[in-house]
């Protein structure tokens, strides 16, 4: 019999560990007992899903394969330790390996009564819905005065105690045999037909049609139009496929899309119930065979790319265009990374196009203030460009009626926008050669994407939050998905390969040259990819709060519970991989917050996200508090200084400029109470708890500034629309971690450099995993330009130098 024994504490010295080790030896002829430690289990946080991390999956797999479970708990403040509680939370959040699993509770404590109260509480927890373990009644083993209970060999001293433990354990063996009979597969019968159900997805309702025959689920059709394109797409293919393949509801949620995953599973369960069957029967069946694949695999490629976001797919496309074979290895079930979550357009100066648009009020003032900067504050390598820009701007200001732009303006704004001081007063700015490549080749990247198949809107030029200038190229399709869908199609149709569910654990090095990767598959199997070169494109570490806190030198505090707009996949893996072969790091102390994030989830796709020229930010008192056209870090700090929570106020015309939304989504959010709407500004103020007169006065003043083209309060850099056409809207916002500027040190060819400034042979990096470009603050819209410019360069250089 196979049993798993869990040490219910992360303490280095524990009598509960000693008890389980004794049981492992003492009952070795009766059962194979595997002891699992909870030392590395993260504290439970439902906004930071760790279900698919190796430590949680180790418990999931071991418990699923075991005949029974033993949990040994100490007693802390009359209950179980928080670390044990966190483990159980993780094992009942998106996975449920304890459901129906025969479980024995034991415990050891200094107290004479052992861990009796903790064991009672643990029993209640294990009986709870979602956990639903089958706990052995009675016969609980409580080891009191544990500090006197063991001899020098770790054996229990008292024979009567051993005898009682024997009786409890032998009863548990019988209990396991009987209880597991309840878990044997049952036959199921449906009333044939197609059943329509509506369940909850991440963004709202998910209508579904489930077709069943007499004994099978035959088809699952989901209307996913309400979900964000690209983010949850894998849910709508994988989960129905595994349900049908295994005729089971024992299907794991997809990492990064747990809400939608559980929505699909709940919807099918409802349909099963409508068809006259018990969904619990399907929940207790084993997983689909494809979900249990453990076969090791080995691949050969010319270039292997770590990360399936924009930078990784751009690198793969460049490798294919050079006539070579790439393999992309992606950590998560779905590709796209942070790119698919991008909420804004892509920066690139295109003066011929931009010049066909009229200038906005305030833009000429922005340029005048820029060229008035004291030259003594400009770093030497940028001074020649700054002086040349002054000449360009002075010529433009003779007729400032149209929208101006140039490569020099883009370069200087990227430089100044990233120039920051840390908490100790140390200054950082973007590496000149990297900034030059970005700004010179940005439009080339737009044209390259167009050639591959991305369509851009030509009827408007826009600007994401904190971009400082209108030079945004907005795709026709939803923002990030527009890039990922086209690049994925290009890579697959031209002979590239993409491996998902495969976090890379190690770089393979041969005689000092990086020659491939070792990854771990969905079920722990080894995946080897041998290649002539490796490109790291795995993103930053915005979803790794501990790593943010470790390196932070810019923000006064990064709270433990801070939200992020990032995919949960970006936890710094590529940076650690680079360090493992000697890579140097740069700018790690600087991270960026997105000021206009959802206050609960950190996401960017809720509410009305409009161009900054139409931002009207008010604090909880109904007053403006910042130049809304400013950089992201300044907007975020201003929001934090005003309590964190603020509101974006909009009217019906401003609503029409919003990204990534529809009237249907807006109506659903108003109904859900996450977006506010009213026929008057005063009524809107009442809904969000403000003084109606204060908010009305704020909007009246703002409208007068738009008319005048000048903001005497905060000197807003650009205006577009007034707020005066009903209905009016308020979108609650709060800063969340959005981007990490630091990373692996690279050169303009994307070689990864070691601490001596030397090239690490065979290793390249592009995108957020690399540092040195954005310095202390990234301009909005520059991340997309970064990943597609340097992603292409990485693929091209890797082929040129190694293949």
Curated annotation (Swiss-Prot):
Pfam families: FAD_binding_2, FMN_bind, FMN_red. It is an enzyme of class 1 (oxidoreductase). One of its GO terms (cellular component) is membrane. The keyword Flavoprotein applies. It catalyses: dihydrourocanate + A = urocanate + AH2. InterPro entries: FAD-dep_OxRdtase_2_FAD-bd (IPR003953), FAD-oxidoreductase_2 (IPR050315), FAD/NAD-bd_sf (IPR036188), Flavocytochrome_c (IPR010960), Flavoprotein-like_sf (IPR029039), FMN-bd (IPR007329), FMN_Rdtase-like_dom (IPR005025), Succ_DH/fumarate_Rdtase_cat_sf (IPR027477). This is Urocanate reductase. It comes from Streptococcus parasanguinis (strain ATCC 15912 / DSM 6778 / CIP 104372 / LMG 14537).
């Amino acid at each position: 019999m196979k049993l798993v024994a869990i040490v219910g504490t992360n303490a280095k010295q524990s009598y509960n560990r000693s008890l389980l080790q004794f049981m492992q030896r003492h009952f070795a002829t009766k059962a194979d007992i595997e002891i699992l430690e909870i030392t590395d289990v993260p504290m439970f946080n439902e906004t930071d899903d760790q279900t698919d991390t190796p430590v949680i999956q180790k418990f999931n797999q071991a418990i699923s394969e075991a005949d029974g479970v033993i949990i040994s708990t100490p007693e802390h403040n009359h209950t179980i330790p928080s670390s044990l509680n966190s483990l159980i939370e993780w094992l009942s959040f998106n996975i449920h390996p304890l459901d129906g699993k025969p479980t024995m509770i034991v415990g050891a404590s200094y107290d004479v009564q052992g861990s009796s109260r903790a064991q009672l509480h643990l029993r209640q927890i294990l009986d709870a819905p979602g956990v639903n373990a089958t706990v052995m009644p009675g016969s609980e083993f409580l080891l009191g005065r544990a500090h006197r209970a063991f001899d020098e060999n770790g054996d229990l001293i008292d024979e009567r105690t051993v005898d009682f433990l024997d009786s409890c354990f032998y009863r548990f063996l019988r209990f396991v045999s009987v209880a597991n009979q309840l878990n044997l597969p049952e036959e199921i019968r449906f009333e044939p037909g197609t059943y329509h159900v509506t369940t909850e997805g991440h963004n709202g309702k998910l209508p579904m049609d489930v077709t069943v025959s007499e004994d099978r689920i035959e088809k699952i059709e989901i209307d996913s139009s309400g979900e964000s394109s690209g983010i949850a797409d894998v849910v709508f293919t994988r989960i129905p496929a595994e349900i049908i393949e295994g005729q089971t509801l024992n299907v794991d949620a997809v990492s990064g899309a747990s809400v939608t995953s559980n929505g699909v599973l709940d919807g099918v369960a409802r349909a099963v119930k409508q068809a006259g069957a018990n969904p619990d029967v399907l929940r207790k069946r084993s997983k689909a065979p494809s979900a249990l694949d453990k076969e090791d695999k080995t691949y050969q490629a010319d270039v292997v790319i770590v990360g399936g976001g924009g930078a990784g797919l751009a690198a793969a496309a460049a490798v294919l265009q050079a006539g070579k074979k790439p393999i992309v290895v992606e950590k998560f079930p779905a590709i796209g990374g942070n790119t698919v979550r991008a909420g804004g357009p892509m920066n690139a100066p295109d003066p011929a196009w931009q010049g066909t648009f009229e200038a906005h009020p305030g833009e000429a003032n922005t340029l005048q203030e820029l060229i008035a900067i004291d030259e003594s504050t400009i770093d030497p390598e940028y001074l020649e460009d700054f002086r040349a820009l002054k000449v360009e701007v002075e010529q433009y200001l003779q007729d400032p009626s149209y929208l101006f732009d140039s490569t020099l303006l883009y370069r200087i704004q990227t430089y100044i926008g990233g120039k920051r001081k840390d908490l100790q007063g140390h200054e950082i700015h973007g590496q000149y050669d990297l900034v030059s490549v970005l700004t010179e080749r940005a439009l080339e990247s737009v044209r390259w994407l167009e050639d591959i198949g991305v369509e851009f809107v030509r009827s408007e030029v826009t600007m994401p939050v904190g971009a400082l200038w209108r030079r945004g190229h907005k795709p026709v399709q939803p923002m990030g998905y527009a890039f990922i869908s086209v690049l994925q199609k290009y890579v697959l149709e031209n002979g590239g390969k993409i491996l998902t569910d495969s976090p890379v654990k190690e770089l393979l090095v041969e005689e000092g040259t990086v020659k491939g990767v070792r990854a771990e598959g969905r079920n722990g199997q080894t995946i080897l990819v041998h290649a002539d070169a490796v490109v790291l494109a795995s993103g930053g570490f915005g979803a790794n709060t501990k790593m943010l806190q470790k390196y932070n030198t810019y923000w006064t505090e990064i709270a433990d519970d801070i939200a992020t707009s990032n995919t949960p996949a970006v936890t710094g893996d590529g940076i650690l991989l680079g360090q493992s072969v000697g890579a140097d790091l740069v700018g790690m102390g600087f991270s960026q917050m997105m000021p206009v994030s959802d206050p609960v989830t950190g996401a960017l796709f809720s509410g009305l996200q409009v161009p900054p020229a139409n931002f009207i930010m008010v604090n909880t008192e109904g007053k403006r508090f910042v130049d809304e056209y400013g950089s992201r870090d300044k907007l975020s700090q201003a929001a934090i200084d005003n309590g964190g929570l603020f509101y974006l106020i909009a009217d019906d015309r401003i609503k029409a400029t919003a990204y990534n939304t529809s009237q249907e989504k807006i109506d659903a959010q108003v109904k859900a109470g996450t977006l506010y709407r009213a026929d008057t500004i005063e009524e809107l103020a009442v809904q969000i708890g403000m003084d109606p007169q204060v908010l009305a006065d704020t909007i009246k003043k703002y409208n007068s500034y738009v008319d005048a083209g000048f903001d005497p309060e905060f000197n807003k850099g650009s205006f577009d629309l007034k707020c005066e056409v009903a209905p009016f809207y308020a979108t609650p916002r709060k800063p969340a971690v959005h981007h990490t500027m630091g990373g692996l040190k690279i050169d303009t060819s994307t070689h990864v450099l070691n601490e001596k400034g030397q090239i690490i042979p065979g290793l390249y990096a592009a995108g957020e995993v690399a540092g040195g470009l954005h310095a202390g603050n990234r301009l909005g819209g520059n991340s997309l330009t970064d990943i597609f410019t340097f992603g292409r360069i990485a693929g091209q250089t890797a082929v040129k130098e190694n293949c």
